[in-house]
Structures are given as C-alpha cells and as structure tokens.
Amino acid sequence: LEQDDNNEIRAFVLNGESIKSLEKLKCKIYYGDVTKKETLLPLFENIDDKEVFVIHCAAVVYIKTKYNPLVYNVNVNGTKNVVDKVIETKAKLIYISSVHAIPEKENNDLIEEITDFNPDEVHGLYAKTKAEAAKYVMNAVKNKNLNACIIHPSGIIGPYDYGNSHLTELVREVSNGKLFATVKGGYDFVDVRDVAAAIITASKKDNKGECYILSNRYITIKELSDLICDVQGIKKIKIVLPICLAKIIAPFFEVYY
C-alpha cells in the first residue's frame, strides 16, 4: 500500500500494544479500542473527499476450551462497531475472518466459500465468534448497503510475526530443539505475504458480498517439523503422538501456558 504515494495509510492500534511492526512504514497511528466505538471517531476524520478502504483484522485468536469474554467482545462487538462506522462513512470494508467461520465437512472433505454464516454450526469459541461476526457483516451487506467482502485465511505462517502467534511459537520450539514429539494430523497453511497481496487485490475489485478462502495445501505437523529441522540442520523429531492423547493432555498445557 505504501508504494503508492497517493495512499494515505492509517493504522488503528490498541493502547499499550507494540508498534514495532509499523515503525518503518509510512502510516499515521491512531490509538483506540474497537470495543469502544467512540475511539474509532478520530480514525474516520477528514475523509469526505477520499475513497476509503477499511481493512479490519483486529481479533483475539483463542484455542483454549475455557470461555473468555474478551474473545467475544473483540471479535464480535468490535466488528459490529467497525461495520457500523464503515456504513456511516460509506467506505469499503475488507473483513479478515477465518476458515474457522465455515463449517467443516464430514470425512474432511474440501470446504468452499459460503455467504450464510451460523455460529451454531462451528465448534469452539473462536470459530463461533468469527462466524457470528461474518454473519453480521453479510447481513449489513444485504440489508444496510454495506460495501464489504470477507477474507478467510487458513493457518497464517510466514515472516514478520512480531506478535509471536501459535504457529510462530511452534516453529521456534522446533527450531530450538525444545519439542520431543509432534502429534498426528496437520493443517492448511497460507503464507502471510500471499494474504497481504490478496487483501490489496480484494480492495480493488467490485466484489460486494463476496467471500474468499485463502489457503494452500494440507501439511502434516510432522512434515512441517521435518522441514524446519532440515533448514536448521538438527535431528528430526521421531515421536508422533496420536491426536486423542494430545486432547487428553491439552488442558494441562492450557494451565501451564
């Protein structure tokens, strides 16, 4: 975005959060909280004569089983506040959702984009909040003339992860030789640079009401760990635990972390 001198880039940052990822970028920083609608006001000032695109990617990624009200407040209520402000200012919204907002199919069949979201059809707090938020976006598209599209990335992986996501932590643990075992199963991963490029492309298209899955291919955790070990020149992890055992011990790791 900053490669185009005509673009004015504004970043909305939660108070107290690190801005290390933005330090070398040509953008103006606004501090606030998506759950507090009034803090969004300065972000949308002086835009009457501009074509405005809002990329909403603020969210709390949550994999624990215990209910956390912050997840709902940010992922759902925060999205509602952003949507309402975008409607008011007649901007275009690119909402960054997740593949978890889409119901899984039986036998791990391939999922496809949907436009009708139902939190009751997905599992886990994070998935339910992303589905409910996506539902709000699509309802606003249909009933309030919101110009928006939805992006559904799979597991985002790649460089410049200043927030140390779960996947980045996994890569570091393997790289440092701290994991003695992996688990069966895997995931569909997507490079963060491809996600960024897709978001920019989506902002330029006439795609009101469209949804896009961003993914690559299924990779087992063992395959990923082997690749990391090859790059690092260290011994590969030989122990692979069944997923049922991983589910049993997961609550203990939740307490630990």
Where are these regions (language model features)?
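NAD(P)H-binding glycine-rich loop region in Rossmannoid oxidoreductase-like domains
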Residues: 17-21, 27-77, 85
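Conserved Rossmann-fold NAD(P)-dependent oxidoreductase catalytic core, especially the SDR/UDP-sugar
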Residues: 53, 77-126
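Active-site Tyr-X1-5-Lys
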Residues: 121-149
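Glycine/proline-rich active-site loop of Rossmann-fold NAD(P)-dependent oxidoreductases
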Residues: 144-146, 158-169, 202-212, 234-236
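Mid/C-terminal beta-alpha module of Rossmann-like enzyme folds, strongest
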Residues: 198-257
